[in-house]
């Protein structure tokens, strides 16, 4: 997993953050994700939290919710702790998603933003199963994710739209077809599984644990 470990390096994380806020249409996906969260959400898990951007939006909507943020990049962990300094409802932990999730209790919502695509495909599926077990009945998993294009030309076009080339794209990316992942979620037991938003290689997939 050497490629994923690029995120250990501060320059890799800082380079991503310098571009992330300029990703086209990203806010549309984030807004749609927020609409899918249960109205009674009181406990949230954010996987691969980065600098806490998505979790910040979630907590703006649910200011009294308890949140657990997981990341393993030293740069991202520092930014997470800075962002949520003084908020006793937020717990920040060092955890690499390549490894099984620790025992964390139940959550009303599990969210992730552009993180799980760094895992191998086998690990992605295992992680979706682990998330299912962590969800409370009726809980929702929302994954705003980078997925594979249908053709290489579409992939190159997408990279160009966000300022990259095949030579400069993140070497840790392990992109997978969206529909394969939706089918995985259904086979695991999630209900109401769908792609709720998509722009090129950016997609929001979500499903609910039966109540």
What are these regions (language model features)?
Residues 1-38, 53:
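Conserved class I S-adenosyl-L-methionine
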Residues 73-75:
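Conserved SAM/SAH-binding beta-strand->alpha-helix loop
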Residues 86-98:
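Conserved SAM-binding strand-loop segment of SAM-dependent methyltransferases
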Residues 142-188, 193-195:
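C-terminal alpha-helical "lid/dimerization" subdomain adjacent to the S-adenosyl-L-methionine
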């Amino acid at each position: 997993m050497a490629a994923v470990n690029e995120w250990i390096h501060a320059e890799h994380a800082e380079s991503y953050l310098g571009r992330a806020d300029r990703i086209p249409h990203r806010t549309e996906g984030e807004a749609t994700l927020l609409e899918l969260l249960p109205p009674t959400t009181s406990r949230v898990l954010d996987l691969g939290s980065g600098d806490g951007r998505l979790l910040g939006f979630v907590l703006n909507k649910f200011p009294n919710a308890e949140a657990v943020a997981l990341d393993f990049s030293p740069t991202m962990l520092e930014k997470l702790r800075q962002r949520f300094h003084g908020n006793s409802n937020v717990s920040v932990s060092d955890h690499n998603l390549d490894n099984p999730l620790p025992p964390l209790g139940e959550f009303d919502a599990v969210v992730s933003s552009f993180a799980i695509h760094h895992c191998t495909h086998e690990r992605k599926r295992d992680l979706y199963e682990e998330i299912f077990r962590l969800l409370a009945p009726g809980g929702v998993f929302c994954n705003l994710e980078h997925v594979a294009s249908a053709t290489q030309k579409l992939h190159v076009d997408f990279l160009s739209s966000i300022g990259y080339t095949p030579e400069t794209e993140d070497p840790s990316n392990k992109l997978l077809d969206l529909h394969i992942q939706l089918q995985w979620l259904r086979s695991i037991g999630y209900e109401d599984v769908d792609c709720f938003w998509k722009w090129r290689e950016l997609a929001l997939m979500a499903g609910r644990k039966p109540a």
